[in-house]
C-alpha cells in the first residue's frame, strides 16, 4: 500500500502544482482569439488616489494592462520590480492598472506599497469583489493585456522578467 502511494505521489504533486498555478506553470500568456466573446468585462473602480476610472475609458485611450496582486505576495513584488524598470518608457502608450485582490488590505497599505516599490505612473486600486469575479481571479500575478477596443489580447498567471515585459509593452504600444 505504501509503495503504491509513493508511486502516485509525483502525479499528485503535478496535479497540485497545476491547480495552484491555474494550469499555467510557465507564466506564459495565453492568446485570446479576438472574438467578441473575448471582450474584457467593463467595470468602474476607484483608484487609491481617489479617481474613478472605468476599463472602457482606459482602453479607449490606449491598450491597458490589468494586473492583480497583493502587497504580501513576493512574486508580485518581483514582477512589479521588473515592470518598474521597463514601464516608464511606454507609459504614454500603455495604461497599467494594478488591482489588489486581498479585500483585507486598505488603500493606505496599497499606497505605502506603491511608494515602497517606487511605482509612479501606475494606477493602483483596492480589491472589488465583482471585478475579481468577472475576471475569474484566483491567483496573484494574474494579468490581462487588453486592446483599445477592450478585446483581451493575452492573459496569464505567473511572473514575467523585464525582457518579456519590454516585449509586451512594445507590442501593445503598436496595437
Predicted regions and their residues:
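Conserved redox-active cysteine motifs that mediate thiol-disulfide chemistry
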Residues: 68-85
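N-terminal targeting signals for export/organelle localization
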Residues: 1-44, 166-169, 175
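Short pre-active-site segment immediately N-terminal to redox-active cysteine/selenocysteine motifs
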Residues: 62-64, 69-72, 139
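A short beta-strand-turn-helix
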Residues: 43-64
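Short, internal strand/loop/helix patches
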Residues: 113-149
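Thiol-/selenol-based redox modules, centered on thioredoxin-like
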Residues: 145-175
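Thiol-based oxidoreductase modules, predominantly thioredoxin-like and allied folds used
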Residues: 94-107, 121-129
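Hydrophobic beta-strand anchors of alpha/beta hydrolase catalytic cores
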Residues: 65-66, 96, 143
Amino acid at each position: 500500500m505504501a509503495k503504491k502511494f509513493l508511486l502516485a505521489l509525483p502525479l499528485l504533486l503535478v496535479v497540485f502544482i497545476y491547480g495552484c498555478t491555474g494550469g499555467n506553470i510557465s507564466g506564459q500568456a495565453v492568446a485570446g482569439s479576438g472574438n467578441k466573446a473575448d471582450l474584457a468585462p467593463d467595470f468602474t473602480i476607484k483608484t487609491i488616489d481617489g479617481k474613478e476610472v472605468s476599463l472602457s475609458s482606459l482602453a479607449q485611450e490606449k491598450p491597458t494592462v490589468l494586473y492583480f496582486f497583493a502587497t504580501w505576495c513576493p512574486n508580485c513584488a518581483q514582477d512589479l520590480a521588473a515592470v518598474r524598470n521597463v514601464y516608464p518608457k511606454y507609459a504614454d502608450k500603455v495604461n497599467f492598472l494594478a488591482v489588489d485582490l486581498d479585500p483585507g488590505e486598505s488603500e493606505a497599505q496599497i499606497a505605502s506599497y506603491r511608494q515602497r516599490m517606487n511605482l509612479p505612473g501606475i494606477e493602483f486600486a483596492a480589491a472589488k469583489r465583482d471585478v475579481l469575479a468577472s475576471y475569474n481571479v484566483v491567483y496573484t500575478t494574474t494579468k490581462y493585456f487588453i486592446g483599445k477596443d477592450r478585446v483581451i489580447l493575452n492573459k496569464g498567471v505567473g511572473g514575467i522578467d523585464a525582457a518579456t515585459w519590454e516585449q509586451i509593452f512594445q507590442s501593445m504600444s503598436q496595437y
